[in-house]
Amino acid sequence: MEKKLKSWQGWLLFCGAMAVVFVLGLVVSSLMERRAETVSVFNNKRVEITGIEARNEVFGENYPRQYETWKETAKTDFKSEFNGNEAVDVLEQRPEMVVLWAGYAFSKDYSTPRGHMHAIEDITHSLRTGAPMDDKSGPQPSTCWTCKSPDVPRMMEAIGVDSFYNNKWGAFGSEIVNPIGCADCHEPTNMKLHISRPALREAFARQGKDIDKATPQEMRSLVCAQCHVEYYFKGDGKYLTFPWDKGFSVEDMEAYYDEADFADYTHALSKARILKAQHPDYEISQMGIHAQRGVSCADCHMPYKSEGGMKFSDHHIQSPLAMIDRTCQVCHRESEETLRNNVYDRQRKANEIRGRLEQELAKAHIEAEFAWDKGATDVQMAEALKLIRQAQWRWDFGVASHGGAFHAPQEIQRILGHGLDKALQARLAISKVLAQHGYTADVPMPDISTKEKAQEYIGLDMEKERKAKGKFLKTIVPEWLEKARANGRLAKL
């Protein structure tokens, strides 16, 4: 005989079922409401955007939430133990770096990076770009604009990629006026993520990969990899190229450059042919546990937020340490203090090796110059210069990736450790050369305890540099902006 439910049990089951249905209804309603709001955003655009629209303010008319958070990249109020979003004079903090870059523009000026809204302002004010008074002068090619503005793909489309690269930096000052923004990463009609610059697409193609087959989650990192990577200016045309053909590691790229017999510059003191790393953030991040587990750049640097029932990516791109509750704690249950200290612990260890490497490498350059002055020959110095090149490449590769000590801490410590070893080997090789010329005492070291002293030692006339830059900023830049406004390159909203 079947057991019958008691009356109260039946009512309990009924009420429970109704509660489940009610909760599910709320969830579905919320999802439908959010979907409807998303559809409403696309169906009720205030302006139609077609082609490459470089003016970020125009996108802001249709996507105010994203635009308002993007404008927050102008803020400079966050500082962590080692980084932040304010411009800090790194050469002032680490004067040895002036010596490491002797003969290269970075010895004049190098600060920590600010947010995307400052991209045009910072490159224009940097002493590294010089003071070009016309379209044909100045130390840098127009390739230096490539990652600074959505005006770049617009110009590439207008005049061709090769023609864009094969010009002086000052040639497009009145055209490249909008800072990094919407069109750099988004299709204008549907806002899908896209690749707006050729170098990444070309690098994939050379490896036999089709970047158009990337998943949406992969694209949340690949749009960043258009710029946050290692690259170089290839040939006389200064064609921007990623050295990925042999792989992502520091050794793979070194082999690529060695095979091409490439150097960014010849060091003014040691005469070593130096490789200048850019910012291999993407490559190093791919060697870390987060990327290997499928976490994208945007997951941590552009976390989701909700406003008025609308979920969207926060376009205030910044360090995840500034918003641990919306980044790290989405997956990790530890306290903010614990998670922050986990990051700092990794950074401190890498920073310790970095400091030692910079000191030894600066001494190697100075000792190499001393050896040349004592009559050393090219043959005698060959091994030492090779070791200096290898040591500095590893130092720069580790340092230029600002988040590398967190993204892939073991790899960064390995790279810096190998760099330190090679710097010490270089100093030993130089001492043997000096011994051949009858010199066995310690090489006298100059006072490079401040940025100013180091710059004077390597022969820079900083007063002249700053004076020329000041004149450029007062005369040429206003002309660029006036012309840009007249041609409608800047928004009038």
Swiss-Prot record:
Pathway stated in the Swiss-Prot or TrEMBL entry: Nitrogen metabolism; nitrate reduction (assimilation)
GO cellular component terms attached to this protein's record: outer membrane-bounded periplasmic space
Organism taxonomic ancestry: Bacteria, Pseudomonadati, Bacteroidota, Bacteroidia, Bacteroidales
Cofactor binding annotation: Binds 1 Ca(2+) ion per monomer.
Protein name: Cytochrome c-552
Molecular functions (GO terms): calcium ion binding; heme binding; iron ion binding; nitrite reductase (cytochrome, ammonia-forming) activity
Signal sequence segment: 1-25
Record-listed heme c 4 binding positions: C297, C300, H301, H407
Gene that specifies this protein: nrfA
Record organism: Bacteroides fragilis (strain YCH46)
An annotated GO BP: nitrate assimilation
